Amino acid sequence: LNNLKGKVESRWSVVDIVIVNVGDGRSVSDALPSDEQWKSTWNSNFESALQTARTFLPILEESQGVLLFVSSIAGIEAFGAPTDYSTAKTAIIALAKNMARKLAPSVRVNVIAPGNVYFKGGSWDGKIKQDKKDVDEIIKSTVPMNRFATPQEIADSAVFLCSDRANFITGATLVIDGGQTVGVL
């Protein structure tokens, strides 16, 4: 990460936005995964986000910038996502809220929490190839908008939270899920 930080600083004179989008959803469905599995998921989803924030925070404090974490609706509600993954994504939201309170007004810290996002090569693409009818039924029964989010919709939300139009927003988690969490929050 320090190598990446050095490259970023040498390329741009001012860095005022850092988006922390790290981790993966690969895990197991066990209620309580093994220690080895837990550590692997925790490290790839939470610890990597924490270390990225820690590495780039001095730059953002200097520029009075924005730190945006990408979490998941799995960090907000139990939807059947793996326990270790959900826990790590919840921890990201808690980290961001605490950082936002302590860093305001110099650095804004927010989170986006996407729901189901479709893109070629993604996990939903593979599931659709296996059983499109089943996936269609899952989406129609769980997402009031009856569709997947697009990567562009997630990107647009990130751009907004990092823009001057969101200058008074810090410590927030923007849920982008087509209404999937409407009845559970």
What are the roles of these predicted feature ranges?
Residues 29-42, 139:
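Substrate-binding pocket helix/loop in short-chain dehydrogenase/reductase
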Residues 33, 78-86, 98-99:
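Active-site loop-to-helix junction immediately N-terminal to the catalytic Tyr of the SDR YXXXK motif
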Residues 53, 88, 96:
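Active-site helix of classical SDR
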Residues 72:
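Residue(s) in the substrate-gating loop at a strand-loop-helix junction
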Residues 77, 158-159, 170-185:
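Short C-terminal tail/terminal secondary-structure segment
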Residues 104-108, 169-171:
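Short, small/polar-rich loop/turn modules that mediate ligand/substrate recognition or access, typified
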Residues 115-142, 153, 183-185:
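A glycine/serine/threonine-rich, flexible loop-to-helix segment
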